Design a protein with these regions (language model features):
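A short, amphipathic beta-strand motif
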Residues: 260-271
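Short Pro-Gly-centered beta-turn/loop motif in secreted/extracellular proteins
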Residues: 301-310
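Hydrophobic/aromatic-rich core segments of domains that either
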Residues: 103-121, 130-140, 145-240
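Short amphipathic beta-strand segments in non-cytosolic proteins
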Residues: 278-295
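Short, small-residue-biased leader/transition segments that mark boundaries at the very start
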Residues: 2-6
Length: 310
């Protein structure tokens, strides 16, 4: 695999990227295969069994709600990665690390367990590159490969945390407010459901509102569809980033008091827009634009919900 090649340092990041560009492989050649028609039932059974096992057995499980368990512990996949049996192996590898706190009263808080795990995860050797090419997620092998960009390391943390029954996932900016790239990082939820974040290899979990990067919009990857957005789309053709809304808009969690609705009057638009049209809020990236939010044109204005700094 690409991550394996880079991890073993047989090639540098530039050479790996060049090899992909010069060879015949292309992401566009990949075929979309639906899980429901191809997944091994034993994979689902094992995933469910191990997810419920850790939720019931770990002391912090009592403070993980059923909804958060279903969304941020139970899912058998993170995105479009190759499927595999991953929970048991990762559990057996990392669960002993938590023996030191398991009987302590504070172990009932999943945040405490997440802190202990991160302290161990970051000391293992890793190979980071911002040049990792676009494509499908690498899958659970990233836990062993420990190579890639911020997205791959965010995946690594999710696999480990979920295998131990700790609610965890990935928050992201489709485009950073101060850079020309997207960015991914991890979140967990404490016993009160409050969001704490970390950016590998930083071992510290901190409150989401402490994240200083200019953000504009922040989304949380989810397993379940955002039915509110599906209904808002009303069957219209959408940009691929929003066509299948497997996300929650969590900008307000990060922006605190710095966000409010952004209203744009039709009087200042440079193009005629009609009622019901889909309009995108974009950030620039070099010589292009990347949509980070969308809205439906109303009678005489556009209203984008909760961008930071508005």
């Amino acid at each position: 695999g690409l991550g394996d090649v880079y991890k073993r340092q047989k090639l540098g990041p530039h050479e790996v990227i060049d090899s992909l560009k010069e060879n015949s492989f292309s992401v566009s050649q990949l075929k979309w295969i639906e899980d429901i028609a191809n997944i091994d039932s034993s994979l689902l059974v094992q995933n469910v069994d191990w997810a419920f096992k850790v939720w019931r057995e770990q002391p912090w499980g009592k403070n993980v709600s059923f909804d958060n368990f279903c969304e941020f512990v139970l899912p058998y996949r993170l995105g479009d990665e190759p499927l595999g049996f991953w929970r048991e192996d990762i559990y057996k590898r990392y669960n002993p690390i938590l023996d030191s706190i398991r009987l302590l009263p504070q172990a009932q808080d999943p945040l405490v367990a997440a802190k202990v795990l991160m302290d161990s995860l970051v000391v293992e050797q890793s190979h980071f590159t911002g040049l990792f090419p676009a494509g499908p997620h690498l899958g659970p092998s990233v836990v062993s490969w420990r190579a890639g960009s911020c997205r791959e390391f965010a995946d690594l943390v999710v696999y480990v945390m979920r295998a131990l029954g700790i609610p965890c996932g990935t928050d992201y900016m489709a485009m950073r407010g101060d850079n020309n790239v997207p960015h991914f990082w991890n979140f967990t939820l404490d016993k009160d459901g409050k969001t704490y974040i970390t950016e590998f290899p930083d071992p510290n979990w901190k409150r989401a509102v402490s994240m200083y990067n200019p953000k504009a919009k922040v989304y949380r990857n989810t397993y379940g569809l955002n039915w509110k957005d599906v209904k808002r789309q009303q069957g219209k053709m959408m940009h691929p980033a929003f066509r299948k809304p497997l996300y929650q808009d969590v900008t307000a969690v990060y922006a605190d008091s710095l966000n409010r609705d952004l209203v744009v009057s039709s009087d200042i638009l440079c193009k005629e827009v009609h009622k019901g049209d889909i309009v995108y809020f974009c950030l620039s990236t070099r010589m292009d634009w990347v949509p980070i939010a969308w809205t439906v044109f109303e009678e005489d204005s556009l209203r984008f919900q909760d961008p930071e700094g508005s």
